A protein has these predicted regions:
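An acidic/histidine-cluster motif and surrounding catalytic segment
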Residues: 1-104, 114-147
């Protein structure tokens, strides 16, 4: 099971309650005792992460940083996820999606990246999207790729 540490110092933006993140991570159904840190960031922080780690001057909704090391309690530290609250909330409006559904999708999408799923080609994209939909259906969330 994946446990999460949520770090949120953002004010004035909608961010789901920690319990939602826990539910989404539980639905991934990862069997090993593990942990992911989710940090809610500002647009400036996300732009900085993109410049530093991807060489791109842009704001993305999420970035996933796989790690996979054991801590002292023999819990696997899978990695970190940065989530830009303002970008996620704005995109929910642009794409006419429910905010909580958008957060669920992007959290699950990011966790799957940390677990090794990719969308670097059509075959991998289909595999990843199917896995996302299998999880999102547990929450009655419609296909996020249909606009």
């Amino acid at each position: 099971m994946i446990n999460s540490i949520i770090i949120n110092n953002i004010e004035g933006e909608y961010v789901p309650k920690d319990a939602f993140f826990q539910d989404w991570l539980k639905a991934v159904d990862y069997k090993k005792n593990s942990e992911i840190t989710i940090k809610i960031v500002t647009e400036d922080e996300m732009r900085g992460f993109n410049k530093l780690y991807k060489g791109e001057d842009k704001i993305s909704d999420t970035l996933a940083f796989p790690y996979e090391k054991l801590n002292l309690d023999n819990k696997i530290i899978l990695g970190d996820i940065a989530m830009c609250a303002k970008k996620i909330n704005n995109d929910a409006l642009v794409y006419k999606k429910n905010k909580i559904d958008r957060w669920a999708h992007l959290t699950i999408h990011s966790v799957l990246h940390i677990l090794g799923y990719l969308h670097d080609n059509e075959a991998n994209q289909k595999i990843m999207e199917k896995r996302e939909m299998d999880i999102l259906r547990k929450f009655d969330i419609l296909n996020p790729y249909e606009i």
